[in-house]
């Protein structure tokens, strides 16, 4: 389907969704679907809920945020369950300004943009449909037409509560255009759009001396004031401020705390009473979610100013910290790179992971337990299993600091350094070492890093390098061991025979001489030590292997090289330890013999086919690991 056909199809769909009728027709719609009359907060909550909620380990995960926000599950759960959900149920939190507070590039703006774009799409669905009085610049709720003294009767009949009063303009239109006949008032379906300023508004502070309150509440229309003769005639007023246009939806208040105080006082009345003052009119009702964002420094100075006390209680603060999981940070970088023009550059496996490790280390706070260092903490936070620790330890660590993740290196800095590496090297391939080098060089140019932080960050780069060294060795180890797969299987079978004899207190028979002999303790320990099985734990480990073999046998399956992850790792490490010399020779010899060359080519092919390297990065990895082993 070409683009013009898609445009035509979209236009047809838009026409199909349009609806216009009288207030009487609208009442029939809400009788069938009361969701249509929901509040702004309820609409936002239902939009998030309708995208899907999954429960993982007792935590709620919202599909709505999945595409753009990574590693913020706990913050998002808190935001939805402590603000949107109770606000949708008409509880008192809906009378608060939602203030997202967090470090730069932490996802605050992305979160707000997602809510805005989400609402635009949601109002195109049946559940998110919004109807308004036709011709109203504030797209007012048609239910405001019902007089206050009849609203209790309406609630008993429809089960819908009505809040707010008809705006001055619509009061006049009702009398002049419809002769006071509410049932004849024209109602239309509207679709939220930030571009068309329908249901979504954005207010950004500028110079306090030149910025006018009219930006928020609208202004006198000088082109019609001569015609209507009075400033208090609503027809001589332009209801085009952000608060007017964001009615029924949401308004983003950018850098709210930088705003002049006179702008903030309007928000007090709007959040608490659901109305605001504009021109020479009665209070104007508005139903909108107000979202603001700021950083921690500005928030602290705002709180310390006694003049702002009345606003403090009208604000609900939601911290949006940096992500603290390596795997999720990696996804952030992948997304940012995919959106750029360098998406075709080959980035060697683990490059983004190593950059993510550095970022996360800068954001973590030193654990209070002496037996856990930052690298272990980083692994545990990422869901890796670290021997001797469990999920309870992770939860305890998370409770140690309330502000963990509110400082550290931001994702944009890392992406800038990766971009710089790609552009400077002008190559088709970059690896972890290139990026670590670039991160190190960039620290001097980072404006907000103190000399003390710089020292810490250099240590974190070294820590990330050590982690990469281990990853690189393992990667080459796997590729080499595959080439010696038969040796691995033989070693495995040999180990299992010995374990079986050990556990059953039997002897083994020598295949050549036929003599009986004791299980080979030296062989078993040389394998078990590779994965840290202590002398005291060896019996339990061997028995567990035997139980696993029996369980497989009962199901008619064969226990093989891939059946036990830790044992496979131990076999690989043992074999690699035995093969180290081969790796050293094949990677460091200037002129390898034919046999060695064949082996190197096999390993390179394996790295390319199964591990995601290209020819350049695979050869660089081999050389690097060879140099590590030669140290």
Swiss-Prot record:
Q: Which Pfam families match?
A: AAA_PrkA, PrkA
What does the record give as the reaction this protein catalyses? Answer: Hydrolysis of proteins in presence of ATP
Null mutant phenotype reads: Disruption of the gene results in decreased sporulation. The mutant exhibits defects in spore formation. Disruption significantly reduces the expression of the transcriptional factor sigmaK and its downstream target genes.
- Mind listing the UniProt keywords for this protein, alphabetically? ATP-binding, Hydrolase, Nucleotide-binding, Phosphoprotein, Protease, Sporulation
> Which GO MF terms does the UniProt record name?
protein kinase activity
**Major localisation:** other
Q: This chain belongs to which protein, by name?
A: ATP-dependent protease PrkA
């Amino acid at each position: 389907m070409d683009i013009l056909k898609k445009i035509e199809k979209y236009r047809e769909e838009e026409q199909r969704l349009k609806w216009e009728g009288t207030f009487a027709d609208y009442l029939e719609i809400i009788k069938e679907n009361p969701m249509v009359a929901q509040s702004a907060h309820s609409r936002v909550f239902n939009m998030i809920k309708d995208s899907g909620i999954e429960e993982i380990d007792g935590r709620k995960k919202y599909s709505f945020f999945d595409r753009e926000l990574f590693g913020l599950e706990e913050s998002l759960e808190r935001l939805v369950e402590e603000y949107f959900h109770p606000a949708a149920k008409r509880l008192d939190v809906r009378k608060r300004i939602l203030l997202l507070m967090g470090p730069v590039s932490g996802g605050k703006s992305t979160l707000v943009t997602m809510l805005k774009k989400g609402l635009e799409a949601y109002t195109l669905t049946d559940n998110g449909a919004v109807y308004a009085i036709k011709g109203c610049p504030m797209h007012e709720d048609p239910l405001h037409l019902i007089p206050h003294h009849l609203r209790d009767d309406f609630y008993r009949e429809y089960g819908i509560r009505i809040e707010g009063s008809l705006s001055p303009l619509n009061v006049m239109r009702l009398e002049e255009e419809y002769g006071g006949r509410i049932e004849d008032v024209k109602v239309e379906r509207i679709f939220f759009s930030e571009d068309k300023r329908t249901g979504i508004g954005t207010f950004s502070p500028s110079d306090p001396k030149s910025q006018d309150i009219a930006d928020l509440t609208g202004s006198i229309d000088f082109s019609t004031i001569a015609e209507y003769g009075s400033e208090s005639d609503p027809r001589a007023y332009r209801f085009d401020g952000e608060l007017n246009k964001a009615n029924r939806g949401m308004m983003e208040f950018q850098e709210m705390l930088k705003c002049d105080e006179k702008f903030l006082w309007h928000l007090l009345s709007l959040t608490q009473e659901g109305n605001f003052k504009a021109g020479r009119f009665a209070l104007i009702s508005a139903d909108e979610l107000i979202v603001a964002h700021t950083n921690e420094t500005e928030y602290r100075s705002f709180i310390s100013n006694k003049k702002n006390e009345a606003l403090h209680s009208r604000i609900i603060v939601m911290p949006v910290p940096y992500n603290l999981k390596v795997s999720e940070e990696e996804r952030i970088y992948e997304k940012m790179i995919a959106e750029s023009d360098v998406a075709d550059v080959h980035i060697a496996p683990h490059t983004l992971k190593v950059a993510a490790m550095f970022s996360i280390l800068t954001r973590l706070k030193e654990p209070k337990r002496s037996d856990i260092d930052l690298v272990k903490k980083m692994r545990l936070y990422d869901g890796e299993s670290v021997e001797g620790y469990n999920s309870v330890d992770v939860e305890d660590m998370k409770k140690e600091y309330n502000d963990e993740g509110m400082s550290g290196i931001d994702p944009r800095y890392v992406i800038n350094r990766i971009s710089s590496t790609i552009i400077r090297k002008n190559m088709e391939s970059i690896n972890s070492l290139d990026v670590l080098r670039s991160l190190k060089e960039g620290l001097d140019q980072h404006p907000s890093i103190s000399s003390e932080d710089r020292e810490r960050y250099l240590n974190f780069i070294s820590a990330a390098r050590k982690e990469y060294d281990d990853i690189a060795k393992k990667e080459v180890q796997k590729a080499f061991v595959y080439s010696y797969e038969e040796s691995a299987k033989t070693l495995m079978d040999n180990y299992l025979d010995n374990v079986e004899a050990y556990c059953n207190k039997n002897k083994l028979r020598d295949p050549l001489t036929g003599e009986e002999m004791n299980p080979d303790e030296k062989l078993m320990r040389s394998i078990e030590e590779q994965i840290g099985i202590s002398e005291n734990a060896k019996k339990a480990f061997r028995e567990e292997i035997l139980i696993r073999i029996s369980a497989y046998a009962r199901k008619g399956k064969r226990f093989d090289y891939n059946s036990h992850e830790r044992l496979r790792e131990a076999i690989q490490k043992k074999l690699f330890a035995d093969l180290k010399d081969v790796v050293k020779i094949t990677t460091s010899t200037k002129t390898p013999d034919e046999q060695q060359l064949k082996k190197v080519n096999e390993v390179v092919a394996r790295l390319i086919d199964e591990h995601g390297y290209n020819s350049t990065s695979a050869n660089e990895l081999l050389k690097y690991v060879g140099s590590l082993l030669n140290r």
